[in-house]
Every structure is written in structure tokens, then in C-alpha cells.
Amino acid sequence: MAKRSLAKLNTSDLSGKRVLVRVDFNVPLNDAGAITDDTRIRAALPTINDLIGKGAKVILAAHFGRPKGQVNDKMRLTPVATRLSELLSKPVTKTESCIGPDAEAKVNAMANGDVVLLENVRFFAEEEKNDADFAKQLAGLADVYVNDAFGAAHRAHASTEGVTKFLKPSVAGFLMEKELQYLQGAVDEPKRPLAAIVGGSKVSSKIGVLEALIDKCDKVLIGGGMIFTFYKARGLAVGKSLVEEDKLELAKELEAKAKAKGVELLLPTDVLLADNFAPDANSQVADVTAIPDGWMGLDIGPDAIKVFQAALADCKTVIWNGPMGVFEFDKFAAGTNAIATTLAELSGKGCCTIIGGGDSVAAVEKAGLAEKMSHISTGGGASLELLEGKVLPGVAALDDAA
């Protein structure tokens, strides 16, 4: 069901209104406490600027890290407030706590177009418990609710789900709307052929998404460490490559399911091997039927890259989740980089390319190709759950579109 969005609320709906906006500001910091990547902050700017332009009083709620329901000075949102202020070119007032007298006083002092950032909502254990009283206190600061934190939409927490019971309208922000449009659109009404590229080290973390994608896709390409579980299930030797012994039957079932449905399931034909798990390891290319003892696969091979590129050439929609190899080591990044380059080229030819969160996003950014993709998802777990066809509590709680 489509959700009501911020785009449908105009100045007369929002001017002078206190708007609680759930954002995803869970950014990485270095040891000195400085932000190393502000992508998530920048991703929320369209929603924040729209609300400022419509004369709203913008109250931002966010979590940061895992403080386990206690105040942790290392997880305060102070550096985020500073960076956001720079990006908006206007002051951002941060509260000492997300609820209570200080938050109330700072919200009451707001003029239209002002921005207040509430302190880390996870300093209260009630946030993750979706406690109704806590949600009511948060909601009490505002008149309207906007959820723009897609990365937290798969959690039923007080600031993502609970507050919607007390605030109407409750709508999707621009980032949330874009995520739903691309990810749901790719699954529900894709332009075909539809291909999914699924990588990463473990089958276990991608079982749900693999099963769902085999149901929906024309082609499924598998890379990353999980391929060795499939090879071992076929009876092939895999050296000392990563294998999930308890998932061998599942790998067989997934291959059989794809075959029964007429879905092209592609595994690499060759792999790049290493003699140990290190950036400077000795390496060699081997056919997957001839992996020697004592070696481990850390990337897909050159022949596999060509086969994958050929399979993707005619696709109109491609979803990518998970790297092809250990791309953090330059020596074993060729497969991942080749997929990133191929998708960038396909985008230029009108293919809808969706990078589904997590390490694939880091890989695309490392390759300098982020701008070339149709959509880069900001959600890791949320992206996977949406692609699996699961209902995201933070989305379900929003008002339905009229």
C-alpha cells in the first residue's frame, strides 16, 4: 500500500507546526570523535530543507550507536549537530535529552524554520522497547510526524512506530519515499528482464532474500564467499574457502528451486584464490572444478566476470546486494569493481540499477561510481527485508496515501 508523503503537505499544512522528523544520523566517527562519512546526514537534507521552506519548526529525532538504554557521552549527537549546521548554513540547537524539561523548553522557544536536534533517543531503553509512555512524551513535542529514516524502518521502536499513534498526519519523508519507490517498485512492478546480484560471505544472512528473489527475478547471479557453500553442495572441493556446513542442503534446494522456476541461477565459473586471508597473499586463478587444497577463494575470477557481464547486458532492472569478493583488499577487488562499472554503464543505457544497502554501497562509493546508479539504498537490514517482501513496521505505521 502506498504511503502518504511529505510532498503532499503544503505550506498551509505545515507553517508554524512542530514537525517531529525521524532521521538516520548513525554516521561513523574516528577515534578523535570526528565524522568520517556524512552521507546519511546529507541524505536527510531534502526533507529538512523542504520543511524549513514551508515554515515548519523542525524537530529531529535520531539514534546513534548502541548505548543500550543508558547515557553514553561518546554517543552524543554533538558532532552531528555541528555538521548539520554547516550543511544547512543555519544554527541547529541540540537538546540535552530527547524528552523532558530541556527538550520542551528548546522546542517552545522555536521560531518557524528553526531546527532542533533531540539527543540520542537510544539513551532511553524505552525507545527500543517501543514503550507507549515514552512514545507519547516524544510525540508531545510535535504536531506532525515525518519518518525519513529508512535504515531504521524495519524496527518497531518508539521513534519509528510508537509515535505515529499520537501524531497525525504521519507521513514519509523524501528519502523514505524514494527508497520505497525504487525497492518496492523493483520487486512489485519491475521492467524486465530483472536480475539480482547477491554477494557477501554467508548464505545464512541472505537466505530470505535469495528465496524471495528466485521467486521474482529472471536471473540471479551469486558471488562472494557464499558461493563455496554452493560448490561444496555440488560435491566440489573448495580448499580452505569459507563454507557453512549446515547450509549445504539449503544451497541444493535453492538451485533446484531456481531450475524448477526457469530462473537462470549463475555461479562463478572460476575464482581468484589466496594462500591466506591477507591483502598481500599469494594468488592464483582456478576453475571452480579444480580448487587446490590449502587455498581459499577471495574473489570471482576473470572468466566469471565476463559471464556475469554478458548475463546482465540485456537487463532492464538490476538489484545488487553484497560484494563479489574481499574488496577491502585491492588485490581481491576486481570482481566487485567490475560489477560496479558494468552497472554504471547499464544505468547510462536506461537500465534501473539499485544498490541495496550495506557493503555494496561502500564498494560503489570506493569505485567513485555512486552518482551513476539509479538508486543507492541507505538501509542495510531494511533493504533486505523489503526485498524479501516483509512488512517494515516503520512504513506500515505511516498514513496510507489517499
UniProtKB/Swiss-Prot annotation:
SUPFAM superfamilies: Phosphoglycerate kinase (SSF53748). Substrate binds at D24, F25, N26, R40, H63, F64, G65, R66, R122, R155. GO terms for biological process: gluconeogenesis; glycolytic process. InterPro entries: Phosphoglycerate_kinase, Phosphoglycerate_kinase_CS, Phosphoglycerate_kinase_N, Phosphoglycerate_kinase_sf. It catalyses: (2R)-3-phosphoglycerate + ATP = (2R)-3-phospho-glyceroyl phosphate + ADP. Its EC number is 2.7.2.3. This is Phosphoglycerate kinase. It comes from Synechococcus sp. (strain CC9311).
